[in-house]
Design a protein with these regions (language model features):
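Structural detector for short beta-strands of small beta-barrel domains
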Residues: 26-50
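Short nucleic-acid-contacting surface segments enriched for D/E, G, S/T with interspersed K/R
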Residues: 73-93
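OB-fold/S1-family single-stranded nucleic acid-binding modules
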Residues: 97-113
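N-terminal capping segments
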Residues: 114-225, 354-392
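Glycine-rich catalytic cores of cysteine/serine-nucleophile enzymes that process amide/ester linkages
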Residues: 140-165, 198-203, 275-339
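...with weaker cross-activation on analogous glycine-rich loops/strands in unrelated enzymes
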Residues: 227-309
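Low-complexity, Gly/Ser/Thr/Pro-rich intrinsically disordered linker/tail segments
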Residues: 309-392
Length: 392
């Protein structure tokens, strides 16, 4: 049982008595958010999210409140502005009116992480080199969360993926975990929704804690193209991600794809974005033996064989002796040693990473005229040269 959920279960025993006595129905409080009441229960799901109760701890008391759902759009969907600020175990100043939270603001920690990534980009610099440097910034400190980077209601970009820079929330969550972290269940044959980070209920309770594959790509694009926080985001479904970039006029999309093998003449260029069914990844280029170095967020197994993982440099190849794996291993071990102590480099199966069905998956290649410029000539370089330039 994760510690967040344990605290909720223990403290929730006092909620019924507090509600029955009519205590704390209106007022202002400094309170720690504990989570949605009855998290993981069958009825605590997206269909009922407008009626959730939310648990807060204030001065050792656990209080349960309704919450304002915000305003509705033309289709009748709320925007949930308060829910999209809530993060478990964080301190807030909340305003309560007749048992409903109507306003809140986070009270910043005095000892927030001062993590500085080995490589990072410059917001708004629309070059291929900057895209790849930006994509490296969350590597090694951002765990895989299914729905991470999507908003609470699972409709678009979260606050974190519409904000410049690596989110301190990702770093904090990473630092609170170890190699036994699992994005879903320690034993997938025995699902445990009440104690899982996986969004069984169809909404994203842990949207803020890490990134899934499309959340990661959305953050990378936002931090490449935007220069201020809070603009429209780029997060969207992984299978059609590459195709949507082509629709923006930023480059070429194709389904004429096969796995490189070093002899068939097919290569993935640095910066190419590949969508397969349920996953999306960024190419760092194709090695001489046909293996490919990539960047992505994936729940790869830890050294204790738990499905955790996250944003990392990986390799697509046939074995751990392939050129791409050796490169990925070199850079992950040297520049991200804490991550490397938890997670070996992930070797991806070429058949899985180049096979797809349907009309939406495919490969996207940037146009240097209408998408990203490439003054460094990265599209024509080998992965070894690309990585050396990025980490220079």
């Amino acid at each position: 049982m994760n510690t967040m959920k344990l605290s909720v279960l223990l403290s929730a025993l006092s909620v019924i008595a507090l509600l029955a006595s009519g205590c704390a129905r209106s007022g202002e409080y400094d309170a720690v958010y504990l989570g949605v009441k009855n998290y993981g229960a069958d009825k605590t799901n997206a269909d009922n999210k407008d009626k959730f109760n939310y648990l807060f701890d204030t001065d050792g008391r656990t209080l349960a409140f309704k919450m304002s759902n915000g305003t509705k759009d033309e289709e009748g969907n709320y925007d949930y502005p308060l829910q999209n600020q809530l993060k478990e175990e964080y301190l807030y100043h909340i305003t309560v009116e007749n048992g409903t939270v109507t306003a809140l603001r986070e009270i910043a920690e005095a000892s927030a992480s001062n993590y500085s990534p080995p490589v990072s980009g410059i917001p708004g610099e629309t070059t291929l080199k900057n895209l790849l440097k930006t994509a490296l910034a969350p590597v090694g400190t951002t765990l895989y969360i299914y729905g991470g980077g999507w908003d609470w209601q699972d409709a678009g970009s979260a606050v974190q993926t519409r904000t410049l820079g690596v989110s301190p929330d990702w770093v904090k969550f990473y630092e609170a975990q170890d190699e036994n972290y699992t994005y879903k269940d320690a034993d997938e044959a025995k699902p445990d929704p009440a104690n899982s980070y996986y969004p069984y209920g169809g909404y994203n309770e842990y949207y803020y804690a890490g990134l899934d594959c499309s959340g990661y790509l959305g953050w990378v694009l936002y931090n490449t193209f935007e220069t201020e926080n809070g603009n429209d985001g780029y997060v969207g479904g992984s299978t059609g991600f590459a195709k949507r970039l082509s629709a923006k006029g930023w480059g070429e999309w194709t389904q004429d794809i096969k796995a490189p093998d070093g002899a068939n003449g097919y290569t993935m260029k640095p910066g190419d974005i590949m969508s397969i069914n349920g996953h999306v990844w960024i190419s760092l280029g194709t090695c001489e033996d046909g293996s490919v170095v990539i960047l992505h967020s994936t729940p790869s197994p830890s050294r204790s064989d738990q499905p955790g993982g996250g944003v990392q440099i990986s390799a697509i190849g046939l074995d751990r002796d392939c050129d791409a794996y050796l490169l990925a291993d070199r850079y992950m071990s040297e520049y991200y040693p804490d991550w490397y102590a938890r997670y070996p480099v992930h070797l991806c199966d070429p058949e899985k990473y180049f096979t797809f069905e349907g009309e939406n998956a495919g490969r996207f290649t940037w146009s240097t005229d209408t998408g990203l410029t490439d003054p460094d000539g990265l599209q024509d370089r080998m992965p070894e040269d690309v990585l050396a330039l990025l980490f220079r």
